[in-house]
From Swiss-Prot:
One of its GO terms (biological process) is CDP-diacylglycerol biosynthetic process. A motif (HXXXXD motif) lies at residues 304-309. GO terms for cellular component: plasma membrane. It is a peripheral membrane protein. Keywords: Acyltransferase, Cell inner membrane, Cell membrane, Lipid biosynthesis, Lipid metabolism, Membrane, Phospholipid biosynthesis, Phospholipid metabolism, Transferase. GO terms for molecular function: glycerol-3-phosphate O-acyltransferase activity. The gene is plsB. PANTHER family: DIHYDROXYACETONE PHOSPHATE ACYLTRANSFERASE (PTHR12563:SF17), GLYCEROL-3-PHOSPHATE ACYLTRANSFERASE (PTHR12563). This is Glycerol-3-phosphate acyltransferase. HAMAP family: Glyc3P_acyltrans. The HXXXXD motif is essential for acyltransferase activity and may constitute the binding site for the phosphate moiety of the glycerol-3-phosphate. It holds the Pfam family Acyltransferase. Belongs to the GPAT/DAPAT family. It catalyses: sn-glycerol 3-phosphate + an acyl-CoA = a 1-acyl-sn-glycero-3-phosphate + CoA.
Length: 834
């Protein structure tokens, strides 16, 4: 590089250092994209911009990547280490420099032809200053190719809203070996790079935004809404104009009013907020979503719903991953001043709790959703319908998902892909409110005062987690499961073919399973799981560390799913982090520390335990079986677990099929044996007395679930003809009684939805006949197996209410060996806080 050019770059770099603060996508390109800094890298940029080049250089040096300003010297030939695909517009249009990208690609390919050991990494990089999509009819957006003067003002105004996006590398060795090294291949490389950058720009900014009134006019002109308006006028005996005005009022209520400037401002506010409230936001598997957007997919984000924070957190994360924040389906309860107008500008569109009896509303909403898909906007909705009060996934609400498929049946949309997302927190700001609601308190209506009270309480929220699950392409799903689905395409009438409901139900279940597959274990939910497993909610520091190590080894060596994330920290680091969250108490004595979960915190901590209960449920069940039997064959263990696995699968959205269960259990047994929690004697599994404490704590993780199943099965066995409503009601009443007598502090223990799911599963599995009567010999077999795993006191409580005398005389379980922290008979602790 000449001396004059060095001076020029140094002078240009001075204002850039002051004005530009760019974000890197992905955050760690070396590890996430598999870059090898020791091998030569050719940086490929979309168009000639020295500001872009110097912005890239700053990030390369920060990431320990080669300097793009230093030429590559290979076999005595010196070539630039960066290339611009296009020259871009000039201030003085009469001067157009020669395009050098094709020549440079050809020179590099020639080097590979002459040097078989050479393999240069071609690394595409986009540098973006601002990401406004622009308005329809208002010219081109800010992300267009800019000349020098325009670039100056873009840097001046948008330098703090800039992104450096690294893409997956292309091996020039592979290109040379597979396609040759002539100029045709060089031209093809340049052409493919242009297409890549064009798609990347669209994925980053999205389509142009319509004027709101223009959108309403287009919706009003649709055949479906025209018909609904006519029906409204006829059924309510009002004028056509009045019915049309009703439709416009509904559009005003529903539609978002997306503003890029609002997104930019909120990004500043949220960046400041997250940095003060959270110790970090952990994001996993975002690259798969970036690739979907770049491939032109219409993306529908379907996260689990933990908190009102979810709306803001997911949009913030997507924006920082170089993606367009989605249009978000928000409950109408959030449409209050000032939150409603703010959320609208951030992409929220509002949805009522129910559409029943309002055909005009359902038609307007469905057409609006379809228009979002047609225009290419990404959409987000919570398939659970509301926030989980227990920390578990709720049964999915399928209305919006059904409308998504109906939008496909209008024809003309891009391929729609559902992206399940697990959102997790070490502290959920509403968790105290959830506990009150589960105890029977009436849900407060959202308002400004409630929002301010919530904000006042925000502090020390620990870590946040956003894990993108395995995408579910709708076209692929329908082609596989409903090959004839295209026969139902109709651009006017909303279609409800016979296959729609079963397909939607199956899709909803798959989404929930994939959300759980992407779960994030963390310090808070692991420590809560261990302490709640102890009947006195306390463990010595050594015992707690031992149990954390047991959980971590299980999750690392026998992972639940490939998308599940497990902390890479040691048990000591996790415990220290959890203690800093001020949820637990530490009592010190001359022997050592005792970690205590205070009574008032216990019911709140079940929320975090429930976030990951599905990850440990099968190891807990194996431990429980071995604890009771002391010696059990693998075959017998598989038979017993197979009897209740369908109930666990339905309740916790587990991903293992019945066919996968034997292999899964073998893997878990091998890991438990490796940890010496049990002894593997070949065909038999034997209790290891030396490691009974961690095994007992592990077994406790499934205790309350099995007790709940036993309650329902005991009622079915005692009264086979009991109807479904009565069965669910009686089960809840008995569960409440059990929780009072035995101090069970689990809010979901007598949750209505849990019993409803259980009864539905029993019917599907054949325990309840088509006539509605229980098949007593089947229910008794499972009940006897479950009751054997309980303490005599719990079993007696259940049978004293439900079981007839002749069925309750089963042999009692032998006493479980005691350990200091888990006495055999718990003291009643009063009414449960649930």
């Amino acid at each position: 590089m000449s001396g004059w050019r060095k001076i020029y770059y140094k002078l240009l770099n001075l204002p850039l250092k002051l004005l530009v603060k760019s974000k890197v996508i992905p955050a760690d390109p070396v590890s996430e994209l598999g870059l090898d800094p020791s091998r030569p890298i050719l940086y490929v940029l979309p168009y000639n911009s020295k500001a872009d080049l110097l912005t890239l250089r700053a990030q390369c040096l920060a990431q320990d990547l080669p300097d793009p300003l230093i030429p590559l010297e290979i076999d005595g030939v010196q070539l630039p280490s960066h290339v611009f695909i296009e020259n871009g517009p000039r201030v003085f249009r009469y001067y157009v420099p020669k395009q050098e990208s094709v020549k440079l690609f050809h020179d590099y390919l020639d080097l590979h032809r002459n040097n078989p050991a050479l393999d240069i990494q071609m690394l595409p990089v986009s540098v973006m200053f601002g990401r406004s999509p622009g308005r329809e009819g208002h010219g081109t957006p800010h992300l267009r190719v800019l000349n020098g003067v325009q670039k100056f003002f873009a840097v001046l105004w948008l330098g703090r809203d800039s992104f450096v996006r690294f893409s997956t590398t292309v091996s020039l060795r592979r290109m040379a070996s597979e396609h040759g090294t002539d100029k045709t291949i060089a031209h093809k490389l340049a052409r493919v790079a242009r297409m890549h950058f064009s798609r990347q720009r669209l994925a980053a900014v999205g389509p142009s935004l319509p004027a709101r009134q223009d959108l309403f006019k287009k919706l009003l002109a649709s055949k479906a809404i025209e018909k609904a308006v006519a029906d409204e006028a006829r059924s309510k005996k009002i004028s056509h104009e009045k019915a049309q005005q009703n439709a416009i009022t509904l559009m005003e209520e529903i539609a978002a009013n997306f503003s890029y400037e609002a997104v930019r401002l909120s990004d500043r506010v949220l960046s400041w907020t997250w940095n003060r409230l959270y110790q970090g936001i952990n994001v996993h598997n975002a690259e798969r979503v970036r690739q979907l957007a770049q491939d032109g997919h219409e993306i529908v984000y379907v996260p689990c719903h933990r908190s009102h924070m979810d709306y803001l957190l997911l949009s913030y994360v997507l924006y920082h991953q170089g993606l367009v924040p989605p249009h978000i389906a928000a409950g109408i309860n959030l449409n209050f001043w000032p939150a409603g107008p703010i959320f609208r500008r951030l992409g929220a569109f509002f949805i009522r709790r129910t559409f029943k009896g309002n055909k005009l509303y359902s038609t307007v909403f469905r057409e609006y959703l379809g228009e979002l898909f047609t225009r290419g906007y990404s959409v987000e909705y919570f398939v659970e319908g509301g926030r989980s009060r227990t920390g578990r996934l709720l049964e999915p609400k399928t209305g919006t998902l059904s409308m998504t498929i109906q939008a496909m049946l209008r024809g003309g949309t891009r391929p729609i892909t559902l992206v399940p997302i697990y959102i997790g927190y070490e502290h959920v700001m509403e968790v105290g409110t959830y506990a009150k609601e589960l105890r029977g308190a009436i849900k407060e209506k959202e308002n400004l005062l409630q929002m301010l009270r919530g904000l006042r309480k925000l502090r020390n929220l620990g870590q946040g987690y956003v894990n993108f699950g395995e995408p579910l392409p709708l076209t692929t799903y329908l082609n596989t499961h409903v090959p004839q689905w295209r026969d139902a395409i109709d651009p006017i009438e909303a279609q409800r073919p016979s296959w729609l409901t079963p397909a939607v139900n199956d899709l909803a279940n798959q989404i929930m399973v994939r959300i759980n597959n992407a779960a994030a274990a963390n310090a808070m939910n692991l420590c809560s799981t261990a302490l709640l497993a102890s009947r006195q909610r306390s463990l010595t520091r050594e015992q707690l560390l031992e149990q954390l190590d047991c959980y971590l080894q299980l999750m690392r060596n026998a992972p639940y799913a490939k998308d599940t994330t497990v902390p890479d920290k040691t048990p000591e680091e996790l415990l220290n982090h959890a203690l800093n969250m001020n949820k637990f108490e530490v009592e010190k004595d001359t022997i050592g520390d005792i970690i205590i979960l205070p009574r008032e915190q216990a019911v709140l901590m079940t929320y975090y335990r429930n976030n990951i209960q599905h990850l440990l449920i099968l190891p807990s069940l194996i431990a429980s079986m071995v604890m009771y039997h002391r010696r059990i064959t693998r075959t017998e263990l598989l038979h017993k677990i197979s009897m209740i696995y369908p109930m666990l699968k339905a309740e916790l959205f587990l991903h293992y099929s019945k066919e996968q269960l034997p292999e899964t259990l073998d893997t878990l047994i091998d890991e438990l044996a490796r940890q010496q929690l049990i002894c593997d004697k070949g065909s038999e599994l034997v209790l290891n007395p030396a490691r009974i404490r961690p095994l007992q704590l592990l077994a406790a993780g499934v205790r309350e679930t099995l007790q709940r199943y036993a309650i329902t099965l005991s009622l079915l066995s005692a009264t086979p003809s009991i109807n479904r409503g009565a069965l669910e009601k009686e089960s809840r009443i008995m569960a409440q009684r059990l929780s009072v007598l035995h101090g069970i502090n689990a809010p979901e223990f007598f949750d209505k939805a849990v019993f409803s799911t259980l009864v539905a599963t029993l019917r599907e599995e054949g325990y309840i006949s088509d006539s509605g009567d229980a098949i007593q010999e089947h229910t008794l077999e499972v009940y006897n197996m479950l009751s054997a795993l309980m303490t005599p006191e719990v079993k007696l409580t259940i049978e004293s209410v439900s079981m007839p005398a002749e069925t309750s005389n089963q042999p009692e379980a032998p006493e479980t060996p005691e350990t200091p922290e888990t006495p055999e008979t718990p003291e009643p602790e009063g009414k449960t806080e649930s």
